[in-house]
């Protein structure tokens, strides 16, 4: 049935008349797809661009994550796990990095809604946070699919998506009652590595026929920490191993189908994540022996995050098109033992007293999709967003005590510095999915954002898909994307200090203070990609070139703004110079035996990833990565797979940036290495599904060291097993 078509004036009138309704990017339920979709919108068309990957629930079952969804997301093209800088600090708290832009430029969504709990954790002088990121709030068994958007396709999501977007879609309510219980265990062969055990449940069904349905899930997980001496026993370093974590999650979704075309969802989630301390002290990758307090805390909980969120999401289908609306709230309490804020002891636990940082986020969004014909078939999208984030962190804002020191721009007395900071960001965007001629699709877009501190920002984009016959498609995109300053960088109350060794190496003498800066500009990246795809009878191949020209990256300052009353240097967070990230991504699918044996491969080759000022990489990532899997469907009940990942060499920083690094930096590289895994899944009967496997079959282990590129532990051989009981 052909969708209703309208002239351009009529279309604009319909959209403008509806501006007061809010929106969400939340997904429609599978059961409502046929009634909810008008025709392909710009958002849906962008998911066909070369920088987009989809991970299904079936994919997750074949390679189950140990605890964090990042375990499988990292196997997508252009994706790695790394820290937010090349310093090696917090090296085992690796997070999702897309196209070398760093974890802070990866936007995590759950059901289309941004998740920002990691922003409640203090941002260090070197640009790291003591956090596991935001990819561990949903257990693997509750995921319907994961969408990974890289490059220009992610620009529509606004601030924080300069690298890309990870959208975790949870399972929807069903029209008949269903439930499941799942159990998973991962047992490392090396007794110095932590074990994992997880259990969760899911219950879904109708409360009032198809008109009112619900879904409820709960999860509990425990991963033990690595042994305190896992690295010391190998190389003599004090670098800590991977810390453990305890997860407790509960999530409810109530879906009301008011009419076949009008759906209202209410969601609520509560999670608690607590660590099990392994001895990390931010700079434990240096030759700094932990103090007695740190030693005594091994195996204890030293920080915990409480995340609470609710949302109201509306989806409607009208004669003129489709509308979406949403209101969301998220609150994170970050409770942890207090840490130092000065020089080499920054980030080291120095007290047995707990303090709490609180981050609250309010969001409203609205979107309208209207199909019409004006010179060509097209679907116009108009969207609006309003975001307000508020941080209150007394421990971090008041940690540096320089009482008696006069510091222009702030106060040395911690009691005189504000513990709070907030930011409001309002955005409006316009997109159009245009079928210019058969086989040619254009997706122009423009986004305008207004920030209460730095003012306005424009983000234009253009994506193209051009058919070159029945088998080959050329796709390209370019977009200007941005990232707003975080609430620590822009806070007048956030003060860090160093006695001298941590000062920039351009400052010859004296101590340094680093002040927050409310006058920062947003970070900007011009993201470009062009790719070609081939599809024929189940065979598929593609290659994509990408380049991000990055400027205004916010860094700890190197320019002396003035001096304190005792002659110490005053610095502040500043917009730095330029950087460039460039690379190639490829994929190959071969149906060796149709419906029986398939071979999938993807690869990433980084051509450049460096600061144009220092030459240092933005983060430590492999030169190349290859992921391949041979998937065998033995029969209707049994399947098996072999997977192999090859990581290229990893180079450390080569250029000194702070005073105590004036000498030659360690040049130790991580050489190329590979990881092999095997897995099997068996549907025992209608209600019982089993899976088991071995990860890192050939036991290739890496140990974290004091310096160089060895900033993390690569765990060795482990055995996993899981069972799901359905009813």
Provide a role label for each language-model segment.
Residues 351, 361-370, 417, 421, ...:
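Outer membrane beta-barrel strand-and-loop segments of large Gram-negative receptors
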Residues 255-273, 298-455, 465-469, 596-602:
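Face-selective signature of the C-terminal outer-membrane beta-barrel domain
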Residues 274-276, 452-454, 470-528, 545-571, ...:
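Surface-exposed extracellular loop regions of Gram-negative outer-membrane beta-barrel proteins
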Residues 116-121, 551, 556, 646-657, ...:
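C-terminal beta-signal and adjacent terminal beta-strands/loops
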Residues 182, 435-439, 545-550, 561, ...:
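Gram-negative outer-membrane beta-barrel transporters
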Residues 174-297, 552, 649:
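Periplasmic-side early beta-strands and strand-to-turn transitions of outer-membrane beta-barrels
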Residues 31-176, 530, 708:
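Acidic, small-polar-rich N-terminal luminal/periplasmic segments of exported/outer-membrane proteins
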Residues 1-66, 70-78, 199, 204-205, ...:
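N-terminal Sec signal peptide and the immediately downstream disordered periplasmic leader
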């Amino acid at each position: 049935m052909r969708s209703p078509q309208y002239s351009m004036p009529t279309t604009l009138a319909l959209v403008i008349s509806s501006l007061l309704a809010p929106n969400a990017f939340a997904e429609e339920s599978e059961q409502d797809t046929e009634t909810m979709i008008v025709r392909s919108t710009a958002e849906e068309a962008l998911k066909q661009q070369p920088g987009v990957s989809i991970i299904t629930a079936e994919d997750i079952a074949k390679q189950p994550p140990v605890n964090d969804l990042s375990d499988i997301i990292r196997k997508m093209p252009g994706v790695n796990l790394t820290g937010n800088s090349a310093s090696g600090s917090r090296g085992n708290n690796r997070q999702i990095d897309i196209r070398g832009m760093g974890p802070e430029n990866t936007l995590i969504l759950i059901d289309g809604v941004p998740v920002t709990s990691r922003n409640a954790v203090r941002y260090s002088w070197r640009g790291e946070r003591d956090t596991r990121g935001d990819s561990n709030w949903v257990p693997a068994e509750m995921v319907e699919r994961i969408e990974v958007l890289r490059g220009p396709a992610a620009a529509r999501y606004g601030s924080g998506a300069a690298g890309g977007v990870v959208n975790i879609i949870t399972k929807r309510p069903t029209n008949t009652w269903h439930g499941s219980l799942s159990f998973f265990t991962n047992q490392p062969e090396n007794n110095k590595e932590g074990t994992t055990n997880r259990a969760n449940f899911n219950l879904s069904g109708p409360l009032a026929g198809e008109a009112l349905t619900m879904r409820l899930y709960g999860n509990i997980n425990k991963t033990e920490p690595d042994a305190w001496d896992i690295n010391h026993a190998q190389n003599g370093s004090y670098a800590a191993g991977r810390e453990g974590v305890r997860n407790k999650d509960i999530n409810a979704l109530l879906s009301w189908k008011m009419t076949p075309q009008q759906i209202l969802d209410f969601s609520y989630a509560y999670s608690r994540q607590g660590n099990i301390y392994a001895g990390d002290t931010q700079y434990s990758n240096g030759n700094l022996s932990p103090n007695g307090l740190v030693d005594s805390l091994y195996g204890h909980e030293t920080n915990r995050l409480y995340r609470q969120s609710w949302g109201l999401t509306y989806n409607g289908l009208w004669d003129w098109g489709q509308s979406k609306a949403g209101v969301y709230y998220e609150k994170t309490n970050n409770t942890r033992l207090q840490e130092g804020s000065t020089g080499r002891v920054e980030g080291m636990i120095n007290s047995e007293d707990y303090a709490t940082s609180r981050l609250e986020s309010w969001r409203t969004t609205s979107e309208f999709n209207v199909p019409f014909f004006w010179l060509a078939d097209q679907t116009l999208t108009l969207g609006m967003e309003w975001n307000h984030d508020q941080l209150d962190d007394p421990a971090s804002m008041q940690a540096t005590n320089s009482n008696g020191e006069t510091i222009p721009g702030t106060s040395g007395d911690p009691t005189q510095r504000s513990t709070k900071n907030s930011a409001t960001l309002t955005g409006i965007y316009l997109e159009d999915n245009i079928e210019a001629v058969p086989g040619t699709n254009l997706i122009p877009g423009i986004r305008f954002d207004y920030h209460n501190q730095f003012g306005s920002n424009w983000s234009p984009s253009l994506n193209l898909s051009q058919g070159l016959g029945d088998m080959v498609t050329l796709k390209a995109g370019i977009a200007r994307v941005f990232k707003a300053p975080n609430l620590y960088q822009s806070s007048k109350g956030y003060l860090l200090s160093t006695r001298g060794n941590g000062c920039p190496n351009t400052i010859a003498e004296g101590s340094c203070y680093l002040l927050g800066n409310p006058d920062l500009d947003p970070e900007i990246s011009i993201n470009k990609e062009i790719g070609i795809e081939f599809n024929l009878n189940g065979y598929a191949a593609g290659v994509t070139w990408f380049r991000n020209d990055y400027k205004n990256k916010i860094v700890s300052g190197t320019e002396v703004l003035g001096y304190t009353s005792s002659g110490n240097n005053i610095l502040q967070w500043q917009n730095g110079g330029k950087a460039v990230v460039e690379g190639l991504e490829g994929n190959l699918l071969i149906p060796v035996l149709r419906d029986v044996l398939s071979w999938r491969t993807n690869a990433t080759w980084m051509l450049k990833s460096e600061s144009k000022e220092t030459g240092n990489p933005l983060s430590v990532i492999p030169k190349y990565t290859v992921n391949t899997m041979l998937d065998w469907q033995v029969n209707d009940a049994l399947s098996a797979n072999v997977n192999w990942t090859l990581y290229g060499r990893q180079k450390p920083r080569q250029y000194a940036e702070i005073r105590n690094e004036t000498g030659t930096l360690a040049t130790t590289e991580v050489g190329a290495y590979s990881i092999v895994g095997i897995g099997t899944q068996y549907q025992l009967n209608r209600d019982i599904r089993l899976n088991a496997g071995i990860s890192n079959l050939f036991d290739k282990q890496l140990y974290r060291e004091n310096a160089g590129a060895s900033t993390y532990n690569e765990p060795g051989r482990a055995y996993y097993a899981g069972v799901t009981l359905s009813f």
